[in-house]
């Protein structure tokens, strides 16, 4: 049985819309108001700089991962397969699109079970929090086992669902389901937002539920309410939420260093300098998605390799110019904030009680 044409068309429309970043980019991620400290007396060899990181038992080449994007249908599956192979070559983690589709079309599991192409890196499966409630813990756990992944991402995407005419409306029970899932799986559990961010208090709640890692996925990147609004020709409502959400930088600045060790940051991180600033602010890993999608669709695999080569060089240059040989030296003490950002962050702290 083939996948319903409307499902495939929806996925294709998502890709087409996301390829035009100016139409679906949300708010501001405030990274341009972070400045990295300059050290004119860096007294070591540039070749000594080490940006390798360890995560889930793997040594990865840099503190960057490719975030989950799409899956299902020939175009999405070919895209995922290509990216997994690229990620394996680069030695960086990668997340796959939601496997929700497999509960209706289990015969397509091979399109999602891509560990055979990811021997050297962590591979993440992905499912919505609502689907844990919908399909039950046991079925989710069994699917995770069949996919042979290294971790599971549970995404929170209420805004997108509420903007989708056929999206989910009942989110009752997601906290209990996340807590239960953490007790029944043998791989790390990552919870992520999908472009609206996670507040400091919600970060603490998620860790109390048993979550291993959190991807803040803040505002400033792809806004999925706008994506759904464009797909459904309903921008009158969607545009009201064009600047909704929490930039990941505000949450990073609000939580202590011990929590940051289990925090990923994403949401509008596109350049090597964006990545350098996110790491300097203390994130364990930085997630990139739409910028990779556009590079791949514009110019193919070579463009993706070039993108990550740039990331590596800019991160290393930033570390050298701030006097840092290692990521541990670079994190949390090599930046300062502009007066504008300090003022905005002050309002944030007052509003969110941090």
Swiss-Prot record:
Q: So what EC number does this one have?
A: 5.3.3.2
The entry's keywords: Cytoplasm, Flavoprotein, FMN, Isomerase, Isoprene biosynthesis, Magnesium, Metal-binding, NADP
Q: Name one GO biological process term.
A: isoprenoid biosynthetic process
The primary site where this protein sits is cytoplasm
InterPro entries associated with the record: Aldolase_TIM (IPR013785), FMN-dep_DH (IPR000262), IPdP_isomerase (IPR011179)
Family stated for the protein in its record: Belongs to the IPP isomerase type 2 family.
Q: What does this protein do?
A: Involved in the biosynthesis of isoprenoids. Catalyzes the 1,3-allylic rearrangement of the homoallylic substrate isopentenyl (IPP) to its allylic isomer, dimethylallyl diphosphate (DMAPP).
Protein name, UniProt field: Isopentenyl-diphosphate delta-isomerase
What species does this protein belong to?
Borreliella afzelii (strain PKo) (Borrelia afzelii)
């Amino acid at each position: 049985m083939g996948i319903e044409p409307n499902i495939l068309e929806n996925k294709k429309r998502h890709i087409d819309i996301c390829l035009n970043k100016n139409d679906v980019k949300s708010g501001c991620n405030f990274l341009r108001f972070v400045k990295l400290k300059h050290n004119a007396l860096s007294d070591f060899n540039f070749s000594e700089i080490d940006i390798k990181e360890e995560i889930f038992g793997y040594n990865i080449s840099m503190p960057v991962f490719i975030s989950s994007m799409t899956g299902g249908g020939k175009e999405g599956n070919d895209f995922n397969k290509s990216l997994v192979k690229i990620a394996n070559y680069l030695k960086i983690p990668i997340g796959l699109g939601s496997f929700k589709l497999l509960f209706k079309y289990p015969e397509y599991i091979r399109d999602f079970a891509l560990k055979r192409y990811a021997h050297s890196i962590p591979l993440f499966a992905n499912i919505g929090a609502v689907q844990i409630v919908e399909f039950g813990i046991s079925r989710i756990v069994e699917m995770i086992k069949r996919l042979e992944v290294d971790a599971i991402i549970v995404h929170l995407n209420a805004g997108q669902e509420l903007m989708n005419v056929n999206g989910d409306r009942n989110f009752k029970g997601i906290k209990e389901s996340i807590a239960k899932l953490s007790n029944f799986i043998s791989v790390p559990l990552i919870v992520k937002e999908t472009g609206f961010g996670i507040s400091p208090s919600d970060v603490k709640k998620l860790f109390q539920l048993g979550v291993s890692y959190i991807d803040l996925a803040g505002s400033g990147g792809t806004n999925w309410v706008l994506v759904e609004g464009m797909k459904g020709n309903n921008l009158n409502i969607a545009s009201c939420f064009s600047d909704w959400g929490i930039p990941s930088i505000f949450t990073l600045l609000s939580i202590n260093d011990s929590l940051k060790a289990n925090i990923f940051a994403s949401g509008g991180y596109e350049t090597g300098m964006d990545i350098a600033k996110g790491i300097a602010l203390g994130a364990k890993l930085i997630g990139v998605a739409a910028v990779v999608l556009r590079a791949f669709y514009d110019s193919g695999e070579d463009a993706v390799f070039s993108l990550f080569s740039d990331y590596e060089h800019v991160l290393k240059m930033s570390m050298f110019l701030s006097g840092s040989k290692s990521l541990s030296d670079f994190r949390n003490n090599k930046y300062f904030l502009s007066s504008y950002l300090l003022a905005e962050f002050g309002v944030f702290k007052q509003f969110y009680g941090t």
